[in-house]
Amino acid sequence: MKPFSSLSFGFAVAILIAAQPACSSKSSGGGGSGGKYGTGGIPSSGGSSGNGGTTAAGGTIGSGGAAGNSGGTTGSMDAAAGGATGTGGTIASGGTIASGGTTGGSGGTTGGPDAGMGGVPGKGGSAAGGAGGSGQDAPQGSGGNTSGTGGAGPGSGGAPLTGGSTGSGGNGLGGNTGTGGAAGGTTGNTDGGTSGVVACPDLPGAERSTLYSITANGAPLFVEKLSKFSPEMQVHYAYASLSGTGAATIAVTVSETFSTYKLSPKSRQISATKSGNTITFSSGPNYLILQVDSKELLFILLDAEETNPPHVGDANVKSLADYTVDNTGATLVTSKIQSAINAASGATQNILYVPPGKYTVGELWLKSNMTMYLACGAILYGSSNTGDFNTGSGGINIEGMQHSLIRMYQIKNTNLLGRGVLDSNGVAIRAAGLNASLLKIEQSSSITVDGIVVRDSSYWNTLSYRSDQVTIQNYKVINCRPTTTTYNNTDGVDFVESTNGTLYNAFLYTGDDGMAPKNEDSNGTINCKNLMHQHIVVYNNSVGCKIGTNSMGQSMDSITFKDVDVVKAGRAMTIEAYDTAVVSNTTFEDIRVEAADSMLINLALDVPPTWRTAADTGVYKDTYFTNVSSDVKQVVSLHGKSSTVNITGVHFSNFTVQGKAITSQTDTDASWDINAYV
């Protein structure tokens, strides 16, 4: 093989970096087991009934729950508050002095069913907390509605323990059942530690997995099986948020016997142990994939706790519940939710809060100057009737993809936030002949999408078209993936003719490309520029990190893929631009490949387009591969088309295959396929 002048290897840089692992931890990486932090209480859905709270070592004085009135009222799910119990409650016992710390007050048990008679106050959540001191008595319940609160503050010497869950209110005759608060104590501040776990309410109608069960810090998480993907790959997933800065202990129990397992991404360097049919490990916020033998995959999706989420009752928040919308999924509620969206745009109450529940909808159009917030446990579920997706006009039709579950068309300053779920029911509407994305952002600016799970798109899941300053983060994509190595057009996130876009901290499980910026318009009036894809986990059948295939227009410039774990893909990194655009200043940096079915790297210009009419005249200039490592030896294919339609300036720095440094294109530790036009 002759040397190619346009191919460069950074020898000095490679030697310098080789002493440091290419998959070293980064600021955005998930937490390891680390030291031990004092933890807050594990949130319980609605609070546990009966037993009083346990005194936390190093905790502050927890206040006892106040007695509720006859027929206790429902406790707030938004606050760390237990529901009110029945009258006649006894005084909660005072806390005892914690070892090296302060005392935590123990709570009482809940009221009985008979009009609250003889009820004992619900306890306050225990917590790791401040300086030690003597315990004090909790106030006597006297029919009041005061809720028990968890202690707060840093621990000071005592060994941190998990704070207790809150107590439930009594069920008085003729009254509503009181419900315990959802929050536990706050995380302590001693060295080392574990995170508190905030679990979502179960999604209405979700199918519980019979293969996997999970606990986080001992609390069960709901594991959903997406069997609707059958006969294609069926998957299971669990989701939670972690409070604090430490790690949670995750235990996964498999109902069937198994011998091997793999936890990915491997770059997280999480040590797991197997005991019987249970796998245990510690992790901070991370998006993880567990492969057990050849069984169906399990996704464990752990986010950091939300910062300042909206609450019902805030001056700028309007709840969807105020519109008497069916939250069981039994009826179509598109028009009611659209009315609520329209009312929020530019209003004082410009945050539309979607509470837990299932809402069956067709196409919805978000508006400027508003926020839609999906609470944990809320799901907007697409109708199976394709006609319900034709609710408006405007926007581009790409490959028959005119409609979407959520539309943002010619708007600005709009947010889509929360820990809820969007599911476009793609399997059903694809079978009915409709190509529809799940989220379509068109000709819009200053858009933020944060935290949600987006599932089952019939076509490209998330599309940003001719938009500027779109930020998508903490994003979980779960699409249908074929059982074979074929693909079904269910891309993850595609920036199309967009500028200054960011995809950060995302999980992309797709049946086609994970990320694939494109140019669609042959006129070339707007082109892709300044696009960042960073801290991503990818598992798919096609390409992990890709530019193309559509590459119309004049240019595609400054596109970066950084800190990406390709757990599995057909091809890991690809530029496949067969049209007219000059693709320049492309960066693949800190890319870690665990599996690639056919190619590790594929830069191609010599494959004729089969379904487009644009001239194949594009070129690739200055493509950088920096800190790229692969566990598999697959083909590195670099193919130009001619002396003018060619590839120039391909730069490798710290490129390793199966642990071996690649220092030239003649190095046999990599599998090279380079033609004369590179």
What are these regions (language model features)?
Residues 2, 20, 42, 112, ...:
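Intrinsic-disorder/low-complexity coil detector
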Residues 1-11:
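Bacterial N-terminal signal peptides that target proteins for export
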Residues 196-678:
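Extracellular/periplasmic carbohydrate-active domains that bind, remodel
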Residues 19-195:
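Ser/Thr-rich, Pro/Gly/Ala-heavy low-complexity intrinsically disordered linkers and tails
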Residues 10-20:
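Bacterial N-terminal signal peptides
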